[in-house]
A protein has these predicted regions:
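Conserved C-terminal structural/oligomerization subdomain of aldehyde/semialdehyde dehydrogenase
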Residues: 12-21, 28, 32, 78-87, ...
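Glycine-rich loop-to-alpha-helix module at the N-terminal edge of alpha/beta enzyme cores
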Residues: 68-69, 73-76, 81-174, 460, ...
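Short beta-alpha connecting loops at secondary-structure transitions
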Residues: 183, 224-227, 312-316, 343-347, ...
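ALDH superfamily catalytic-core signature
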Residues: 242-247, 269-270, 275, 283-432, ...
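Rossmann-like NAD(P) dinucleotide-binding subdomain of oxidoreductase/dehydrogenase enzymes
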Residues: 141, 145, 170-325, 522
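Hydrophobic face of amphipathic alpha-helices that form TPR/SEL1-like repeat modules
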Residues: 9-84
């Protein structure tokens, strides 16, 4: 009898989802941090506090801190002699334990009413908006070398928006029920979590994505194993602590820093893998698909694979473009956060009649841009994330310098003696298929192709076919017919397409983010489209008065 009652209670918990409404979300306001403002003073204090000590970061498995003894350092990219933390890397034992913990926590978490799951993430948003705003911003600035504005729009505003909007979109999903229940029947849909656990693999470049990738599947009733980027463990650990303080039950999200290859290989060999939520390089994502494909016969269910990967994002100017607006978009789109945004502009197409004036405008703006430590708030550009990134970006600059098809027309300097600093660099090429027009660089490098203004349509075709990616892109024009032509011809060139604006800065609730082709599965983070990937619908029909005769009227 006890088991029967327990079963009924659990069933009712799952069905009793919509006797409430979550608060209607609004985008978190972006603070200015202007000189003399209280937020600026608070942030300066937070930076000073975090700079005082090197903290120790464990794995967090089933709510418990796990210190493995296999360690690495979190360093400041802008001053690589400064250590922020020492973190403990998960090995085979810890990875297996994280999987077991996620599986053990799954039933109770899935059965928790949606109201209570939502409340946890709404509380996390409130804590981040108030108590932890400046600490997480400071952690992102120091650990990932973001300037004050880039940290604010990322680790504060966007993550708060993810947590608030996700609960709202989830409610809208649960509200979707069959339109028809004929007389004597009741049709309804139950939205179940996936059977197994979800593996979240998060990047270094957006703290908000680090928080969203594990929490969005969790909101929908899934339990998660989370591997943060090794260069963003510092801010990731702080997010995990915020979620714990918000009431997240033990085992729902398990935080395991460590080797991506080792953790990934163990995870993809688990028969209980139900899904993967990924942001990172196309190369790594392809490897994940390959591993899943090779193991497809062992899984209990086909894993849901959701990924946002690389980009070779473009700005395309028509001869009717506003030159000042175009130049500002190029500087912000290409060089904010050192070009390390998935959406960053990396190639630009300029008509020959605009090029001289555009270049003059670019040089005037860039002459005022400074590069340096995040503690100096006057810098627009800071350091790239690590030595590997520095060397890779430098190799593209050196390749352009030695090529007969390209020339450096601005910048080109770099120095890693203190931090991993690379000057904003403009490369002009005569070949629209030049290497730096095709391959993702992920650094402060923008390549320009000057095209004959009479060949607008032909150059649009080149833009569409040059790169394997399809993430973001912009068209700059005042001529509406030109805008329409670009809109149509570049339909699959960008999952986020901007008209007279830079191709970066998607806002939750306004421009759901993601792209196709080699840029990912285009499941649009920050929207219901993404949340739907983390549920498995069950259609249920109840007949109140069942048929008592097998025969149909035509048989008489």
């Amino acid at each position: 009898m006890h088991l029967f009652i327990s079963s009924v209670i659990n069933k009712n918990r799952r069905l009793k989802k919509m006797f409430f409404s979550v608060p209607v979300p609004k985008n978190e306001s972006v603070l200015s941090y202007a000189p003399g403002s209280s937020e600026r003073d608070n942030l300066v204090r937070a930076i000073a506090d975090l700079s005082k000590e090197i903290i120790e970061i464990p794995s967090i498995i089933n709510g418990k801190e796990v210190f493995t003894g296999s360690t690495a350092y979190c360093i400041e990219p802008h001053n690589h002699q400064n250590k922020l933390a020492i973190y403990h890397k998960a090995g085979q034992k810890e990875i297996d334990l994280a999987i077991q913990s996620a599986l053990a926590a799954h039933k109770e978490w899935e059965n928790m009413p949606f109201y209570h799951r939502s409340a946890i993430f709404l509380k996390a948003a409130e804590l981040l908006s108030t108590k932890y705003r400046f600490l997480l911003n400071a952690a992102t600035m120091l650990g990932q070398s973001k300037n004050i504005h880039q940290a604010e729009i990322d680790s504060a505003c966007e993550l708060i928006d993810f947590w608030r909007y996700n609960t709202y979109y989830a409610q809208k999903i649960y509200e979707q029920q069959p339109l028809v229940s004929p007389k004597g029947e009741w049709n309804f849909t139950e939205y179940r979590s996936l059977e197994g656990f979800v593996f979240a693999i998060t990047p270094f470049n957006f703290t908000s994505i680090s928080g969203n990738l594990p929490s969005s599947p969790a909101l929908m009733g899934n339990t998660v194993v989370w591997k943060p980027a090794s260069t963003a463990v510092y801010s990731g650990y702080m997010i995990m602590k915020i979620l714990q303080e918000s009431g997240l039950p033990d085992g729902v999200i398990n935080f395991i820093p460590g080797s991506g290859e080792e953790i990934g290989d163990i995870i993809t060999n688990s028969p209980h893998l139900a899904g993967i939520h990924f942001t990172g390089s196309t190369k790594v994502f392809n490897h994940i698909w390959q591993c899943v494909g090779e193991n497809i016969h062992i899984y209990k269910s086909y894993p849901r694979i959701v990924g946002e990967t690389g980009g070779k994002n473009f700005i395309f100017a028509h001869s009717s473009a506003d030159i000042k607006a175009l130049a500002v978009a190029c500087v912000r789109g290409a060089f904010e956060y050192q070009g390390q945004k998935c959406s960053a502009a990396s190639r630009v197409y300029i008509p020959d009649n605009l090029y001289p004036e555009w270049l003059k405008e670019m040089k005037e703006i860039l002459s005022t841009v400074t590069v340096g430590d995040v503690r100096d708030f006057s810098h627009f550009v800071n350091a790239v994330i690590d030595k590997n990134s520095f060397d890779r970006i430098k190799s593209y600059i050196e390749s352009a310098q030695s090529s007969s098809e390209a020339e450096i027309i601005y910048g080109g300097s770099y120095d890693d003696s203190v931090g991993y600093f690379i000057e904003p660099t403009l490369i002009k090429t005569t070949n629209p298929h030049f290497t730096t027009m095709q391959e993702e660089i992920f650094g402060p490098v923008l390549t320009i192709y000057v095209y004959p203004s009479s060949k607008f349509e032909e150059t649009l075709k080149i833009c569409d076919s040059t790169s394997c990616y399809g993430l973001t892109g912009s068209i700059f024009a005042q001529d509406r017919q030109a805008i329409f032509l670009a809109y149509e011809m570049l339909r699959h060139s960008a999952g986020n397409f901007y008209i007279n604006d830079k191709p970066t800065g998607a806002v939750v609730g306004q421009q759901p983010f993601g792209g196709g082709r080699a840029s990912g599965t285009n499941d649009k983070a920050g929207s219901a489209l993404n949340l739907q990937r983390w549920i498995s619908a069950r259609s249920i029909k109840e007949t109140f008065v069942p048929a008592e005769n097998y025969r149909y009227p035509f048989m008489d």
